Amino acid sequence: MLKFLVKAPAKVNLFLHITGKRSDQHHYLESLFVFVNVYDILEVDVGGSKRGVYFSNLRISKYNNTVYKAIELLLKHSAVCPNVSVSIIKNILVSAGLAGGSADAAAIMRLLGNMWNIDYTLLQDLALKIGSDVPACLESKTLFAKGVGEDILLLPDLLLPKYIILVAPRGKTLSTAKVFNNYQSATYSPSICDKLPVKQDDWMELICNAKNDLLEVALKFVPEIEEILFVLKQLKNSVIARMTGSGATCFALFNELSHAEDAARKLQMTRPDWIIFNAKIL
């Protein structure tokens, strides 16, 4: 039996625009992804007697989850068929706009895909079958994604503020499907694909002028998001504040570690009703 320890980083959408909808009701998106040092931990056993996915601190079915679906998909394209058992310690908030389930699926796909010599292009195609965030999480690097998540432009040299605080209302979750199903717009956001900056300095201007098109829908289900964003925008030295994904987690970016630490400390002392992470962009 082989044993592995794998980390799955949380994602943050610095902006998220909805540019249209396909006939199958999937939305076309354009989004800038970053990944942060908040990790789920996966303990993976390959070739043992157990099979399934086990969550140490959550009640989630061991067979009905993104990681199990990823394993089953990979086994269909592998020359081997061993038992795979995964124990997951969840540190990424669930149903919070941080792609925890997608990150976990991508982490197991990276590990087993490499072990079983599965072509990376096939791996990307399989990732999309699990969820629209999984191809981006497969990369876990700063990137621009469009389409339904399958069209990815890696931006490894993009210079952004490195320090980020994540804030979510305690006890509140938001289903991605619920938010998207309730999203209605008379006009979609125009595509910015032909306006992506060439110069590094212009990216922050683009990010600041962008938005999260899902915010209005998320506020209907979790109105606390509005107060979180208001407070984050008032923080000293905050570069930008926005909601990530379908919510309800919001973030603020900082150029200096000390500024992020001061902001996180202040919030932790004054807002016990909020969950706060002080993190760094990878």
Curated annotation (Swiss-Prot):
InterPro entries named among the record's database cross-references: GHMP_kinase_C_dom (IPR013750), GHMP_kinase_C_sf (IPR036554), GHMP_kinase_N_dom (IPR006204), IspE (IPR004424), Ribosomal_Su5_D2-typ_SF (IPR020568), Ribsml_uS5_D2-typ_fold_subgr (IPR014721)
Catalytic activity: 4-CDP-2-C-methyl-D-erythritol + ATP = 4-CDP-2-C-methyl-D-erythritol 2-phosphate + ADP + H(+)
EC number(s) reported in the record: 2.7.1.148
Positions of ATP binding: L93, V94, S95, A96, G97, L98, A99, G100, G101, S102, A103
Gene Ontology process terms (BP): isopentenyl diphosphate biosynthetic process, methylerythritol 4-phosphate pathway; terpenoid biosynthetic process
Keywords, in A-Z order: ATP-binding, Isoprene biosynthesis, Kinase, Nucleotide-binding, Transferase
Active site: K11, D133
Biological pathway: Isoprenoid biosynthesis; isopentenyl diphosphate biosynthesis via DXP pathway; isopentenyl diphosphate from 1-deoxy-D-xylulose 5-phosphate: step 3/6
Molecular function as annotated in GO: 4-(cytidine 5'-diphospho)-2-C-methyl-D-erythritol kinase activity; ATP binding
Role played: Catalyzes the phosphorylation of the position 2 hydroxy group of 4-diphosphocytidyl-2C-methyl-D-erythritol.
Entries under HAMAP family matching the protein: IspE
Cross-referenced NCBIfam families: ispE (TIGR00154), PRK14608.1 (NF011202)
Family according to the record: Belongs to the GHMP kinase family. IspE subfamily.
Protein name in the entry: 4-diphosphocytidyl-2-C-methyl-D-erythritol kinase
Organism, scientific name: Ehrlichia chaffeensis (strain ATCC CRL-10679 / Arkansas)
Gene: ispE
